[in-house]
Every structure is written in C-alpha cells, then in structure tokens.
C-alpha cells in the first residue's frame, strides 16, 4: 500500500491536534545549525517486496525479495543519523514493510532513539499477533490504503482478489491491539464518484484520518492515463475537499496535491478566516510539496530522493552519510528555491505554500523544475523577465 504506491507512507502523516504521528510537530526545529531546513518526515522503503500488484504502484513491486536491500546493521547505522537532521517522523514503508523480517527490531531501535515511527502496510498481512508487535515496537499510527468502498472496486485496483476483506480484517486487528490508523485513498476516475462512500467507511471503521492522494503517473501508474482526472476536475475535487472537511471532526488531508494549500488560502480569504493552526491545524504551518524541503524518501537500496515518485539520485547512504546528503544535495538546494522553478510555478505568489508537484512536472516534461501540469491557476505576478 502506501508502500510502493504511496511512497510518502502516511502521507505526511496524521497532522492532527493531540496524539498521533505529528504529536509534537510544533516542537520540531525549523532549521539546522548550518541554516538548512530541518527534516520533518522521512519515508523509508525498508523493502520493495509486496504481496499485492496495485495498478498505481510507482515501484512496480513484486513478491520476490529484492537484491541489495540495506542489512540490519546498515539500517541501524542509518537510523543513528536521523536525529542529526532534526526530529523527523520516520515512515516505515515499502513495498509492504511487513515483508521485512527485522521490521520490528528496526522500529524498536528508532523508537529507542526518541524518533516517532509510523507504519504503512497494505493491511493484508496484519494478524492479531503482529498487530500487538506493531504496538509494542512503538508504532504511533498505521496507514492503510483503501481505494473503494467495497471489494469490487478496491480489489480490481489492487490486483488481488480478497485484498479488501484482508485489509478490513487487518484494521480490526489493529483496533483490537489499540493501534491508531488512518485510511489513504488515491483519486482516480473510477473511484471519484464513491468518495463520500469511502469517507463513510472511514468513519464507520473509526479511522483517525483520511488522506486523499492525487495520482502521480510513475511506475505502473504510467499505464493509467485514462484514470488521471483533469486539472479542472482536480480543482473541483480540492474545493469539495475544503468544504467537506468542515463537516467532520476526522482529520482530512490532501497529499501530492500541493495546490490544495493555494485553494485553502483563497477560500479562507473569501470567508475572512485567518489561516492559523486554530482554524486549520498543521495545514496552516506547512506547504504543499515538502520534497527535498522538509521531506525525503530513502529507497530499499539506500538511494535518497526528494520523494518516492521522483527517482532523482541525491546520493546513497552507503556512500555518503545521510545528514550530508540532506544538507548538500544540489537537487534539494534547487527544490528549496521555489523562485527558480520553471513556468508559472516560479513566479506564482503561492509558490512558498504550494510549489507544485515536482514529480508530476518531471513525468510530463522530463524536468524536475517544470511547472505543475495539473493546475488551472494563473499567477497574478508576471515572470521577472516581463517585469523589466
């Protein structure tokens, strides 16, 4: 699940008030001693192996073991470096991370260093026994991907009959063990008409949060062109999402949808509502795309990337210490300078809170600095060349 298909794991997890994966987020340092931004979230693909065959899997994961995965010793050495870049939340993702034999050992090790850990399995491998192991290892939240309100739609998308029922059973085991969970849903043309039904399912299950993901056409998802909704439809969906979040106490978040943060500010201004944590929670304190800015992805072989959808090699932890990659990667430097983005994103007045999806721009154009292709907004500011 948010494993290979959602490389951000818990979708910049659980930014809600009180307990949860972002509990204490207010206390995260904003910058490091050298002036680099602190890392808030690390999605770590501890294995690429997965027992499902999801149509939108960016990793095109399969069940067999992958060569070159970090050893237990290498993994622990990597974990030792995480506190040097701030106080990041560690998202154990995959593939399905539960297919890694030493998973609980690694989570316990990270928890022992004071790191907050969340887990992103697809849910089908969760049992009563390992749900207790998940809790005892120190996992603060699990995210489970559900892409339809029933087995028919979900199983077709996941590529394995019975996946829906297995995930439902896994969620029940998490509940029995007292492990908090959220639901992640990828927006496609097929499931969009059922979004209210999916939300109702989230409510009935007792999910702490519902995160929707805008599809990034990489990996197997590159073959899903017909499932990608248009820029105009995304605008409509995100405006609906803004309104819908007011109807529930459940935490709702749009992920891989940086333009939501522009829409949120536009709508809040229309309503005369200050964009503050009291009114919008952590959404008021973050930006749309955190890739290379407050978030990064580490692959199963140790390659550091801005995100799981964007396979830019920023360095490998086997060759260079992770904190050095975080501080000095040229790709990260570029991402941290939004006025250098190409097209309208570079001169948009919302580039500090949105930034566009670098991965979608790269997929569509071949440039990681390209403008967000699924955005209808036309900036009020003119490009610098036009202002001369």
Swiss-Prot record:
A molecular function annotated in GO for this UniProt entry is: 4 iron, 4 sulfur cluster binding
Tell me its cofactors: [4Fe-4S] cluster
So, what pathway does this thing act in?
Answer: Porphyrin-containing compound metabolism; protoheme biosynthesis
Q: Where is the composition biased (Low complexity)?
A: 1-12
Return the Pfam families for the record: Fer4_12, Radical_SAM, SPASM
Which terms under GO biological process does the entry name? Answer: heme biosynthetic process
Quote the record's binding site residues for [4Fe-4S] cluster.
50, 54, 57
Its keywords, alphabetically, are:
4Fe-4S, Heme biosynthesis, Iron, Iron-sulfur, Metal-binding, Oxidoreductase, S-adenosyl-L-methionine
Which residues does the annotated region (Disordered) include? 1-29
**Coiled-coil regions listed:** none
NCBIfam families in the cross-refs: rSAM_ahbD_hemeb, rSAM_more_4Fe4S
UniProt xrefs under PANTHER family: RADICAL SAM DOMAIN PROTEIN, TUNGSTEN-CONTAINING ALDEHYDE FERREDOXIN OXIDOREDUCTASE COFACTOR MODIFYING PROTEIN
Q: What name has this protein been given in UniProt? A: AdoMet-dependent heme synthase
What's the encoding gene here? ahbD
